[in-house]
């Protein structure tokens, strides 16, 4: 009897444990089963459970993928702004190249200023500009000098207007000397230049003759106008050279030489009048 009671107790305990262990399993199974159903409502307004259609689900996923794919590709092609890498520039005060450039500009500016000051002293007296012109001073030389000062100055020169006015005045007076050259019967008006030569010192006369010989050697080589301009051959000395050679005493037989001089004067003037950067 006692043994029967013990067996009955063990049976009861084991059965209870099996029930407790089986309960979560059934609940989870029920949850899994219900999770595969989707809530829907019929035409009568009653809620029904319908199993998910696997093919419909895959179709929806494919449609979503196709809808998102263009946006993803567009995002992938979008270029993000690159981070700017700071680097030394020519304008940086710490760049040694900037200092070298500044020193070079200063030296060029000082040289141009020195030549301008020397020229002003040279052309300060009476008839001094005409005398300097006979010695080889040309508008192109002044133009280059003016442009150097403007280019190598760190700011607008304080005497910019004065330099421009003096340059324009010289150019205007210089080309007036050729007004008679373009008449039907060319006139050189070299009488006043001869007076200036006679008033020169012996050294000045020798220098002017040497300059005429140099111009003669260059012209006789048959260079083009562009080449003569690049060498800055003085048009006035060119004309004086032809006068010394007697070209204007017989215009009919020397028409080609006179026409060549005319063409050079025109080309030279056009070159001078063309504006340049910094000028």
From Swiss-Prot:
Keyword line: Host nucleus, Secreted, Signal, Virulence
Gene name of the encoded protein: RXLR152
Renumbered ranges of motif RxLR-dEER: 47-62
Protein name: Secreted RxLR effector protein 152
Stated role: Secreted effector that completely suppresses the host cell death induced by cell death-inducing proteins.
A GO CC term attached to the entry: extracellular region
Comment field on protein domains: The RxLR-dEER motif acts to carry the protein into the host cell cytoplasm through binding to cell surface phosphatidylinositol-3-phosphate.
Annotated localization: Secreted; Host nucleus
Lineage: Eukaryota, Sar, Stramenopiles, Oomycota, Peronosporales
Family: Belongs to the RxLR effector family.
Signal peptide: 1-22
Entry keyword Cytoplasm: no
Organism domain of life: Eukaryota
């Amino acid at each position: 009897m006692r043994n029967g009671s013990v067996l009955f107790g063990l049976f009861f305990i084991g059965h209870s444990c099996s029930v407790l262990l089986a309960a979560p399993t059934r609940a989870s199974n029920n949850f899994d089963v219900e999770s595969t159903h989707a809530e829907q409502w019929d035409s009568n307004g009653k809620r029904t459970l319908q199993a998910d259609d696997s093919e419909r689900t895959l179709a929806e996923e494919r449609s979503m993928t196709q809808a998102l794919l263009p946006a993803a590709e567009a995002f992938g092609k979008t270029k993000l702004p690159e981070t700017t890498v700071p680097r030394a520039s020519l304008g940086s005060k710490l760049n040694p190249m900037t200092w070298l450039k500044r020193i070079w500009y200063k030296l060029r500016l000082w040289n141009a200023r020195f030549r301008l000051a020397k020229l002003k002293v040279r052309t300060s007296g009476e008839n001094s500009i005409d005398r300097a012109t006979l010695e080889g001073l040309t508008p192109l030389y002044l133009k280059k000098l003016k442009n150097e000062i403007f280019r190598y100055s760190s700011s607008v020169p304080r005497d910019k207007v004065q330099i421009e006015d003096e340059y324009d005045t010289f150019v205007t007076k210089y080309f007036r000397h050729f007004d008679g050259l373009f008449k039907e019967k060319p006139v050189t008006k070299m009488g006043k230049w001869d007076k200036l030569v006679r008033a020169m010192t012996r050294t000045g006369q020798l220098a002017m003759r040497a300059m005429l010989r140099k111009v003669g050697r260059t012209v006789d080589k048959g260079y083009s106008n562009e080449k003569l301009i690049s060498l800055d051959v003085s048009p006035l000395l060119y004309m004086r050279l032809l006068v010394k050679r007697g070209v204007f005493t017989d215009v009919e037989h020397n028409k080609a030489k006179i026409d060549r001089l005319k063409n050079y004067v025109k080309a030279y003037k056009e070159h001078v009048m063309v504006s340049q950067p910094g000028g």
